[in-house]
């Protein structure tokens, strides 16, 4: 796995030697960032269920101002730190080793993010709750992206408006904006 574009293009990212982590494929990550390109420069990004950190590192490489990585697995959080170090990234990020829902609850609404990227385990029980919590931290013109199994259709909280689905193999990227912003927004 490598950083696809930007300042750290071509840098190798370590992948886990243990089961249970499903890193976003290079192809799907490239598709995602081609869509997000106009939103990345200077953005405040939250990478939830960060795993290897590949998605957040890609955002940093492409000019995000700050990335908050949230990952509850200690080995994965250490892997994120290692990947950041291997890429030579010395700042512009925070790694939080915590359960994503609890970490979202602990953040203040003033802590708004321009992009929230969530890649929960496909068998997670309550995507609705996580989407609801994340929506409270989304900037008024922000975008929330959920990577999910194509076969699993998420229930969507009323404060979010679904604007796009991008399918790739067994995975789908579902994109949301705040429902109150949906009338005046340009969609990704």
Where would I find each of the regions flagged by the language model?
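Class I S-adenosyl-L-methionine-dependent methyltransferase catalytic core
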Residues: 1-188
């Amino acid at each position: 796995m490598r950083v696809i574009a930007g300042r750290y293009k071509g840098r190798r990212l370590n992948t886990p030697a243990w089961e249970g982590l499903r890193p976003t494929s290079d192809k799907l990550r490239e598709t995602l960032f081609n869509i997000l390109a106009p939103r990345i420069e200077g953005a405040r990004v939250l990478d939830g269920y960060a795993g290897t950190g590949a998605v957040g590192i890609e955002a940093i490489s492409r000019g995000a101002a700050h990335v908050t990585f949230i990952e509850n697995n200690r080995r994965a959080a250490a892997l994120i730190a290692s990947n950041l170090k291997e890429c030579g990234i010395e700042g512009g990020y925070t790694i939080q080793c915590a359960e994503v829902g609890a970490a979202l609850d602990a953040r203040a609404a003033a802590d708004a993010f321009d992009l929230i990227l969530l890649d929960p385990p496909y068998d997670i029980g309550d995507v609705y709750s996580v989407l609801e919590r994340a929506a409270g931290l989304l900037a008024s013109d922000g975008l929330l992206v959920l990577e999910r199994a194509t076969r699993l259709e998420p229930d969507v909280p009323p404060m979010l408006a679904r604007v796009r689905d991008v399918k790739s193999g067994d995975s789908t990227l579902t994109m949301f904006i705040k429902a109150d912003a949906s009338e005046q927004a340009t969609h990704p």
